[in-house]
A protein has these predicted regions:
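Structural detector of well-ordered beta-strand residues that form the stable sheet scaffold
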Residues: 32-33, 53, 181, 211, ...
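A short helix->loop->beta-strand "cap" motif at the edges of active sites that frequently abuts
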Residues: 48-51, 208, 265
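Conserved nucleotide-sugar donor-interacting segment of glycosyltransferase catalytic cores
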Residues: 13-83, 133-134
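Nucleotide-activated sugar donor-binding and catalytic core shared by glycosyltransferases
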Residues: 25, 68, 81-130, 173-174, ...
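Donor-nucleotide binding loops and adjacent catalytic segments primarily
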Residues: 130-247
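Short His-Asn-centered micro-motif
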Residues: 34-36, 184, 250-251
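Generic beta-sheet signal
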Residues: 35, 55-58, 129, 149-150, ...
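Conserved nucleotide-sugar phosphate-binding/catalytic loop shared by glycosyltransferases and other
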Residues: 1-6, 81
Length: 345
């Protein structure tokens, strides 16, 4: 309860600051580009009379096909329908931000809004930064919103330590046994070491090799070193690693999910928050990996079964290869740049 209260207070303070700080900047430029979590952006763009490109890394547009991506149970339910869940999400967002937004809108001579979720989506140019082949779209969007979808904006210019990369590649290439990569990305979990311990023991039994992306949280730091384990302590870009792995187990962030899909590898997701359960569900629906597991609850025997399926199931490999070709055909960075430039003309 206290954590939620702090989040609400921080969000409201951020909205006040954004109106003050961003308006002078936008007045000197042509287009505002901001994430869907920048709650003040629609009002700022309206005041400056400038186009607003509202981006998101998951389908955060109200619809009738799927629940909100932040909802922890992403499979559509015939009783608790997606439409009902979107209404519930809008109530929460209205409680958090509507009064603060309207206070600032009145200050700048703008009409108040009645529903933040609908107002933000309807008064923006919505650009979805995920693959149409990996995420979903909803037919009702065409009737309600201005929207486009361009694919993931992969960052292949990420700087890395060449020596660390060569050390990793030497580990991967020294044997022919399957290689699993595990990462929690920029997230963490109180159960990360328990989960890493299970991964290491299972890999030892099955003669897999395990690479753990340690990250800022130092995931895997308690693991005992052995010839089947590589603890990656320096950041190395995913596009240089994943093509050399047999499968990836990860937290389900949009970027990591897309990177594994682009590499054409099966994946198993251990979602922690926000849209991660959604991407875990999509991985299962598309047949590029098994049903997601909860890092805090999965047993070692269940995880071992999932890992064996992940490595050996030929359908995952076939579907992942097909998905890779589709994602490779998208030009995410080029698409959003062209879209922004079209609005700035």
């Amino acid at each position: 309860k206290q954590s939620f209260k702090r989040i609400v207070e921080w969000t409201r303070e951020a909205i006040d600051k954004q109106f003050v700080q961003v308006i002078p900047l936008l007045e000197q430029n042509d287009v505002l580009v901001a994430a869907n979590t920048e709650f003040a952006a629609t009002g700022i763009a309206a005041y400056c009379k400038k186009p607003f490109v509202r981006t998101s890394f998951a389908p955060f547009l109200p619809g009738e096909k799927m629940p909100p991506p932040a909802f922890p149970y992403p499979k559509p339910n015939p009783i608790i329908t997606p439409k009902l869940l979107w209404l519930m999400m809008n109530r929460v967002s209205n409680y958090m931000v509507k009064d603060t937004i309207n206070k600032n809108r009145r200050k700048y001579g703008l009409a108040p809004i009645s529903n933040f979720g609908e107002d933000a989506a309807k008064n923006s140019d919505n650009f979805l930064l995920y693959s149409r082949y990996l995420g979903h779209t909803d037919p009702v969007w065409d009737k309600r919103f201005r929207w486009n979808i361009g694919g993931d904006c992969f960052n292949d210019t990420f700087e890395y330590d060449e020596e660390a990369y060569q050390e990793l590649m030497a580990f991967i290439k020294k044997e022919q046994t399957p290689v699993l990569f595990f990462t929690l990305g920029s997230c963490t979990s109180n159960d990360r070491e328990r989960f890493c311990g299970m991964l290491a023991r299972i890999c030892k039994r099955k003669q897999y090799r395990l690479v753990v992306g340690s990250g800022w949280a130092k995931t895997g730091e308690t693991l005992q070193g052995n010839e089947q384990l590589f603890l990656m302590q320096k950041p190395i870009p995913h596009h240089l690693i994943f093509p050399h792995c047999d499968a990836v187990i990860h937290h389900g962030g949009s970027g990591t999910t897309h990177s594994v899909a682009r590499a054409g590898k099966p994946q198993l997701i251990t979602p922690l928050l926000l849209d991660q359960p959604y991407w875990g569900y999509r991985v299962q629906v598309l047949g590029v990996g098994p049903e997601r597991v909860k890092i805090a609850k999965v047993s070692e025997s269940e995880l071992e079964q999932k890992m064996g399926d992940l490595i050996s199931n030929p359908e995952y490999k076939k579907n992942a290869a097909m998905l890779s070709e589709q994602i490779e055909s998208e030009k995410g960075i080029e698409n959003i740049c062209n879209y922004i430039e079209s609005l700035a003309r």
